[in-house]
From Swiss-Prot:
It is an enzyme of class 2 (transferase). GO terms for biological process: pantothenate biosynthetic process. Its EC number is 2.1.2.11. It is found in: Cytoplasm. One of its GO terms (molecular function) is magnesium ion binding. The active site is at E179. Catalyzes the reversible reaction in which hydroxymethyl group from 5,10-methylenetetrahydrofolate is transferred onto alpha-ketoisovalerate to form ketopantoate. This is 3-methyl-2-oxobutanoate hydroxymethyltransferase. The lineage of its organism: Bacteria, Pseudomonadati, Pseudomonadota, Gammaproteobacteria, Moraxellales. Its main location: cytoplasm. 3-methyl-2-oxobutanoate binds at D43, S44, D82, K110. Mg(2+) binds at D43, D82, E112.
Amino acid sequence: MTTLSTLNKFKKDGTKFTCLTCYDAMFARMMEKAQIDTILIGDSLGMVVQGHDSTLPVTVDDMAYHTANVARSNKQALILADLPFMSYVTLPEAIANSRKLMQVGAHVIKIEGGSELCELVTMLAQAGTPTCVHLGLTPQSVNVFGGYKVQGRGDEAGQKLLDDAKAVVNAGAALLVLECVPAELAKAVTEAVAVPVIGIGAGADTDGQVLVMHDMLGMAHGRTPRFVHDFLTDERNTEHSIEGAFALYQQSVKEGSFPKEQHQFS
């Protein structure tokens, strides 16, 4: 079974690892067969499962339901689960909501933000709840950003993101996710912190990669993000199957053939 210790060893050894979003039992079993290292029950389910145009309407109960479905069905992957929008504004509610997700099978709780999360990260760590802090493009803040845009461009913004990463790691964060940031910045963050860093639209130099499952199967609604590759229709997926797409993703990340330059931002 993949644990945080496994991911830390991967980072130390320079071994890349994989993460995919998942929301139900059947796909969780397929990912176990493909040996996907980590699974994220993301609040992206608001868009790809519930049909909303953002992640904002997702509730803690929604997250708990889908986390339980996945955790029951995959005993090999490290399970990450999102705390959804406005569910961790105060420390008491953050702790209560984290407990709810951990009790149904999450191993790590993912939260979005920067150095303002330090107190929460420390409290959760002291309570035995590992956290993954999501930096860069944070979808729960889409209205603040004015849309889904690359973050961390320019010296000031890049330094702010790097400082935030160091701060939350010093506070006790066990993992980081970097979304839609310049590849060179993602590399700098990955080298600057001791914990594993997972990238999405953040270049090839992060320790791990994550994609939304529906996107990497060519099921994206609307415009396909630049950082996505369709592994289902890839000619190397000789089975032309979902299981084959998961296995090809796992292989491609491990061998370093994904992501390529066209999947990253400068």
